[in-house]
Amino acid sequence: MERELGMYGNDRSRSRSPVRRRLSDDRDRYDDYNDSSSNNGNGSRRQRRDRGSRFNDRYDQSYGGSRYHDDRNWPPRRGGRGRGGSRSFRGGRGGGRGRTLGPIVERDLERQFDATKRNFENSIFVRNLTFDCTPEDLKELFGTVGEVVEADIITSKGHHRGMGTVEFTKNESVQDAISKFDGALFMDRKLMVRQDNPPPEAAKEFSKKATREEIDNGFEVFIINLPYSMNWQSLKDMFKECGHVLRADVELDFNGFSRGFGSVIYPTEDEMIRAIDTFNGMEVEGRVLEVREGRFNKRKNNDRYNQRREDLEDTRGTEPGLAQDAAVHIDETAAKFTEGVNPGGDRNCFIYCSNLPFSTARSDLFDLFGPIGKINNAELKPQENGQPTGVAVVEYENLVDADFCIQKLNNYNYGGCSLQISYARRD
């Protein structure tokens, strides 16, 4: 069904003004969802200047040229790690094609920008722009739904990335923009418009582990099966209930996503024990926490402390390292999430993907499926012996994103494997 877009009709004007360019919601005419395939800045299109892009090279270098959850390189990396275990999709010996960059843009108004100063609640993130789209084009386009504070084009090392951001003066303009322009044609490209989110703080600031000195001066609590939405601050706030928290950490992967476990350090043993008694087995956002004493806590000649150690070790057998504990539990979590899930379900938010390369990691799932929409969870389905099956289950927050995932990624060649994707069903 066509959306009423006012002046943005299907008739293309000779004017280069963006308000006269074609803009419709005819999804059947959707061109290939590749930021660089149809317009690579050749001689037929003039290059335009990125006037003052707020996400400049400084931003891209700080975050590895990638923007967090909603801004993955698209299409997903084709290199893939093959079933033989080659890590070619990361640029190794798999022969996978690298990401094609847009044309180099000039910066006549380049300036430094602190991303934390922007009002993300009033901002949108726009994907699949043509490489000659400018901030002025975005401002004029989205100015039809609300007053625009600023519009920007995202670049990487001087190259147009086919993405941009728009900040409005009012929050309600965000939903108006998404409703009106998500999926609409603009400059012959189908736009993908989403709520903008702040970039994660530097991973080293969040994921660095507590030093041995910090642990020696306190009592560590290790928490497994944390909701993936929980960061160190919310973890700290939660565990304040049991005492003064010296430090809280959530373990992140190389993409800056939570790995589902973390730690809290208290100054006293009593606070540590109270936290274990309070939170172990508690359900938070549908996940049951497993809370235990940290491995490196000091042993003290204290009957109560030693008894507590014995009780804990009785419940978990021999004491493995933190990484081993976490890995085992992550496998258990994946098994529970994917248990009884099969392909061929009715329309729902869960996606069943088979024929993945056996060496695909969980973080790869976010790279592959994340650009489509917000993911609640994604897990690889293991065999009973823990070996990979090449199957994953992905839960999207929105049904429309699940629909779009099947439309765009079914039969997609990933790491030399043709993915088979359908709605999931739980038997």
UniProtKB/Swiss-Prot annotation:
| Modifications made to the protein after synthesis | Methylated by HMT1.
Where along the chain is composition biased (Basic and acidic residues)?
Answer: 22-32, 50-60, 300-317
Q: Which organism is it from?
A: Saccharomyces cerevisiae (strain ATCC 204508 / S288c)
Per UniProt, the keywords (alphabetical) are:
Chromosome, Cytoplasm, DNA-binding, Nucleus, Phosphoprotein, Repeat, RNA-binding, Telomere
What GO molecular function annotations does the UniProt record carry, in alphabetical order?
chromatin binding; mRNA binding; single-stranded telomeric DNA binding
Q: Which SUPFAM superfamilies match?
A: RNA-binding domain, RBD
Q: What does this protein do?
A: Binds to intron-containing transcripts and is involved in quality control for the export of spliced mRNAs from the nucleus. Binds to pre-mRNAs until splicing is completed or until faulty mRNAs are degraded. On correctly spliced mRNAs, GBP2 and HRB1 recruit MEX67 to allow nuclear export. On faulty mRNAs, GBP2 and HRB1 associate with the TRAMP complex that guides those pre-mRNAs to the exosome for degradation. Binds single-stranded telomeric sequences of the type (TG[1-3])n in vitro. Influences the localization of RAP1 in the nuclei. Involved in modulating telomere length.
Which CDD domains would you find in this protein's record?
RRM1_HRB1_GBP2, RRM2_HRB1_GBP2, RRM3_HRB1_GBP2
According to the UniProt entry, the note on domains is: RRM 1 and RRM 2 recognize preferentially RNAs containing the core motif GGUG. The atypical C-terminal RRM domain (RRM 3) does not interact with RNA/DNA, but is crucial for interaction with the THO/TREX complex.
Q: Which Pfam families match?
A: RRM_1
Q: Does this UniProt record's set of keywords contain Chloroplast? A: no
UniProt subcellular location: Cytoplasm; Nucleus; Chromosome, Telomere; Cytoplasm, P-body
Where Phosphothreonine occurs, residue numbers?
T130
Q: Where is this region: Disordered?
A: 1-101, 300-319
Q: Which residues cross the membrane?
A: none
Q: What else is known?
A: Present with 2540 molecules/cell in log phase SD medium.
Bias (Low complexity) ranges: 35-44
**Location of Phosphoserine modifications:** S24
Q: Which GO terms describe its biological process?
A: nuclear mRNA surveillance; poly(A)+ mRNA export from nucleus; telomere maintenance
Looking at the record, the residues that make up the RRM domain are 122-198, 219-296, 349-426
Q: What is this protein called?
A: Serine/arginine (SR)-type shuttling mRNA binding protein GBP2
Q: Name one GO cellular component term.
A: cytoplasmic stress granule
